Amino acid sequence: MKILVVCSGGLDSVSLADKMAAEHELIGLISFDYGQRHKKELDFAALAAKRLGVPHQIIDMTNIGASLTGSALTDDLDVPDGHYAEETMKITVVPNRNAIMLAIAFGVAAAKKADAVALAVHGGDHFIYPDCRPGFIDAFQIMQAHALEGYADVKLLAPFVTVSKADIVTEGAKYGTPFDQTWSCYKGGARHCGRCGTCVERREAFHLAGVTDPTDYEDPDFWVSATSGFQAREV
């Protein structure tokens, strides 16, 4: 199958790109600039595309992102520290983000005669993000079948949707993903902060997978206290 991967430049989507390149015909990576404070992630998506020898397209959604207010990822709000599953992390929701991005990705995929769009949502996303859950994935596929009926048959692949981030680390290691060439931190500083929800989840995932974490964190040990009382699991 010819696959277009939605790639932010993060650990999950870069690992997915490597998996798709190994198992199918990867025709390109598509990324989105929606005004996120951690825009440097897009540089890591570009690195992945160059390494894999495929085109990389960045869709400018900054005008749209400016209207999706109330998120710490796009507004002048503090990104909270702590575990990814805490209620405080809801401030990182960008409303309807995946639905908007996927609608664009499906249009691009149809135009490029791709067979599928691949997305790296995973079980750990379910706590906070409704557009990362299996129900959303299934419903979006049905909607797109109607939207492209008679024009194109594009599938939505979400192979990580029911597994943990630790499982993604295992998959990435299997396919040789250079984890030091991925970006997760929502704060978008010079180094991974080690304290925001996505840094904590990243650090925990390497630990649970038994894979060496090459990431340079400002606070490499915060994850231990942040994850106490939580149990990473498949959802």
Curated annotation (Swiss-Prot):
Keywords: ATP-binding, Ligase, Metal-binding, Nucleotide-binding, Queuosine biosynthesis, Zinc. ATP binds at residues 7-17. Pathway: Purine metabolism; 7-cyano-7-deazaguanine biosynthesis. One of its GO terms (biological process) is queuosine biosynthetic process. It catalyses: 7-carboxy-7-deazaguanine + NH4(+) + ATP = 7-cyano-7-deazaguanine + ADP + phosphate + H2O + H(+). Catalyzes the ATP-dependent conversion of 7-carboxy-7-deazaguanine (CDG) to 7-cyano-7-deazaguanine (preQ(0)). Belongs to the QueC family. This is 7-cyano-7-deazaguanine synthase. It comes from Allorhizobium ampelinum (strain ATCC BAA-846 / DSM 112012 / S4).
